Amino acid sequence: MSTEAQAGHWQDSWRDGWLLRARAVASPNFGPRPAGGGIDLIVLHSISLPPGQYGGPEIEQLFCNRLDWDAHPYFQGIRGLAVSSHFLIRRDGELVQFVSCDQRAWHAGRSSWRGRDNCNDDSIGIELE
């Protein structure tokens, strides 16, 4: 496939910042990106909820503000946390998208990279289960 064909193929895979190949689960935890900025950073995280447990619904519940804080003792330490990520790649390979790439997900917290603060402003957050 030519480079032009590959580029066209990927352009057809997106709509309003959503990757059509991903399962969309809209998170309320996002905001606008600063005007005039662009995306030039990818932040990779690893996550399991509760820690060391995989494949359950808790990550999606956390990112959508639906986690039962009383379901596991660990959750008391993160009670009230409002976070999200653009993408989650599950251990079985499933790709889930929570926030449009045109928007600012809340994954990096207070952050700095190479002298720039607020990494959420110009990054894509990807969680690896």
Regions found by a protein language model. Give the residues of each.
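Active-site-adjacent loop/helix surface patches within enzyme catalytic domains
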Residues: 2-33, 41, 48-129
